Amino acid sequence: MANSSARPAFLVMTALALLLLLCVGPGGISGNKLKLLLRKREAPAPTMTPVAVQESRAKEFLSSLRRPKRQLWDRSRPEVQQWYQHFLYLGFDEAKFEDDISYWLNRNRNGHDYYDYYQRHYDEDSAIGPRSAHSFRHGASVNYDDY
């Protein structure tokens, strides 16, 4: 009985001694490895690099730079007003243009709703219909492509 309880204690003591030997003992040429791991690295303090221009002069120079905004379609310019009036005279409608842009930009975002990523624009109620009977819905009174 005494022999069986002494074996785990002996194993624990051996493991502790081995751990202490590994951690505290000298690590060959480099010395104590645990101390080397735990010690903070000593680095020299960063030195200020010499600068040709003082900070205040540099900030003054950078703050003086102002980049003018380049707006081609600035409505306050008289030639732009003239161009815009001419576009309106030609039939250009800005609201319709914005609608068209949003339509064409969003067209491919939900393309899988229509058969195989294609949006086909023929009339469902036409007499002949599409060439393939399985490619489109027949007989509805609405052309679903328009919605």
Swiss-Prot record:
Signal peptide start-end: 1-31
Main localization category: secreted
Annotated localization: Secreted; Cytoplasm; Apical cell membrane
GO biological process: anaphase-promoting complex-dependent catabolic process; cellular senescence; central nervous system development; G1 to G0 transition; negative regulation of cell population proliferation; regulation of cell population proliferation; response to wounding
GO cellular component: apical plasma membrane; cytoplasm; extracellular space
Coiled coil: none
Keyword Secreted on entry: yes
Keywords attached to this entry: Cell membrane, Cleavage on pair of basic residues, Cytoplasm, Membrane, Secreted, Signal
This protein's record includes keyword Cytoplasm: yes
Propeptide positions: 32-68, 132-147
Family named by the database record: Belongs to the augurin family.
Function: Probable hormone that may attenuate cell proliferation and induce senescence of oligodendrocyte and neural precursor cells in the central nervous system. ECRG4-induced senescence is characterized by G1 arrest, RB1 dephosphorylation and accelerated CCND1 and CCND3 proteasomal degradation.
Protein's UniProt name: Augurin
Source species: Bos taurus (Bovine)
Native organism taxonomy: Eukaryota, Metazoa, Chordata, Craniata, Vertebrata
Designated gene of the protein: ECRG4
